[in-house]
Amino acid sequence: KRLLMKKAVILFNLGGPDKLENVEPFLFNLFNDPAILNLPGFFRFPLAKLIANRRAPTAKKIYQELGGSSPILKLTEEQSHALEIKLNKDDELSDYKCFVVMRCWHPRAENVVKEVINYNPDEIILMPLYPQYSAATSGSSIKEWNHVCLKNNFKVKTSTICCYPTDKNFVEAHKTEIIKKIKNLDNFKLIFSAHGLPEKNIKKGDPYQWQVQQSVEEIVKSLNIKNLDWILSYQSRVGPLKWIGPS
């Protein structure tokens, strides 16, 4: 029997609180990331504590409406399972195993890396589930993963999928979902809502905004609706800095 190449696929996502009492620690992890609050540690730590504490009551109300927790882990695990089945079906020369790593809640990189070491792969593929690249999302997750591998002295051939803002299947999936919702084009506005970023991140060269624009333009093009009324907006602004807009 031929030996299969063992390939570990690491799927990165943000994570979310699994219960209401974890909303504040989740928010702290989010804002204590230097890619989010670009400040020295001794400033960032207390500021992250303060922001998390201030935002927790509002965030808790939102999670309450979602049933008391974030659905992101369950949905990402479903994606991971479906991808693993498809990869093993499509490539008979390799044995694929998918692992989920969350940046701001569990499962964290430091725990998942131990499972990957046990799996003992010949190759690792890093796959952020953010279609558009930003240093604050994909960049931060990849950086943390590399740091954890270094700490565990774990060296394996690794390749990284950066981003896929105009991938045809990604565009097609959006088109399908949008078409399902269009009841009457005469009284219809399509609002694209992407997560915002501070403007200074973009000015420093972060490609996120133009990749979001690329995604939206491709989706609009694929819909092929004459005089479609659409707009791109950005959400979730935090702190005093100027963020990209319109909000």
Model-derived regions, located:
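Active-site-proximal alpha-helix that buttresses catalytic centers in soluble enzyme cores
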Residues: 5-247
